[in-house]
Amino acid sequence: MRIQYEGLALPVTKRFIDALIKAIEPHREPLAEFVCVNFREPKYSAEDGGYHPVEILLTGTSGRYDICYITDFCYAGIGDCAELVKSLDFEFIAGTFQDMTGYYPIEVAREIYPIWEDNFLTYWLDMAVFEVEVI
């Protein structure tokens, strides 16, 4: 399996790609056009907080995939009105970036993406806070 990361608008690291491949490989259907990977911390809630859920969608064929998007979710609202919303959304195919304030060209995320990725990898690989599901 190969995930294209060179030449992207954002500085996706080899460490990120290698970890993603390692998580996907045991579960991936050989001819799958889409691979969706969900990362969830079971205790995350609107009331108590925790580690944001993350969804990564890959698209491709013949074992070669592109990152379609990486979305980090958070709760917005209070009490029964709280709902999961996109906190950060890196849309590689569409070339857009979304945060809680609006939509922007993806290049706007050049500074925040490395910080997000480093934090995410720490939570996932070093602290093991996520349950990972490959669809």
Regions found by a protein language model. Give the residues of each.
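Low-complexity, intrinsically disordered terminal/linker segments enriched in charged
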Residues: 77-99
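Alpha-helix boundary/N-cap detector
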Residues: 7, 11, 15, 83, ...
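Short, solvent-exposed aromatic-acidic interface loops
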Residues: 67-80
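N-terminal domain-onset segments
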Residues: 1-44, 128-135
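Hydrophobic transmembrane signal anchors and adjacent membrane-proximal interface regions, especially
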Residues: 3, 58, 73-75, 90, ...
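Amphipathic, interaction-prone secondary-structure segments
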Residues: 28-67
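Generic structural signal of hydrophobic/aromatic residues within well-ordered alpha-helices
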Residues: 16-20, 24, 70, 112, ...
